[in-house]
Amino acid sequence: MWLGVVTLFPEMFSSLKDQGIVSRAVNNGLIEFELYNPRDFAEDNYRRVDDYSYGGGPGMVMKFATLEKAVMKARADAPAEAKVLLMSPQGATLDHELINHLSAEHCQSFILVCGRYEGVDERFIEKCVDLEISIGNYVVSGGELPAMVFIDAMSRQLPGVLGNPDSSCSETYVCLLYTSDAADE
């Protein structure tokens, strides 16, 4: 699986790539990461990626052109046609059913866009985004944490990532778990 992550904070993904099952998947060549900082596609000397909301209101909005250029670069780098996913509190809730659906589509390339500030320019969503994804009915500071949740959940679906291939079929949220040592009580 190929992942292009558009983020203002690429360093946040180093721990995900360096530890746990995602690290194992990266080291075994099952997942490939590319990180794209929108600031690298900004056109001004200040590398500005946000602007005031047209019509006013609090907070800043991520600029259309900067995000579009980052996604276009990621699309060009992707080994196969990539599905563009925007991490957004308005999106479809990321749950086991959605993960299974996306993995069943056999899409092997995803571009994850991590929003910040008040959000992203709606023109970017309309033109570039295939699906908005939310990790729940609350707001976090940016799309990086939801993107990491998506990456971890999707990586569990890849053959060879988990130690036991049956682990992804019987996820632990469906039943109570106990260890075999009753003496611990």
Please provide the spans of the model-predicted regions.
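A short acidic, often aromatic-flanked loop/helix-cap motif at beta-alpha or helix-coil junctions
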Residues: R39-D44, A92, V139-S141
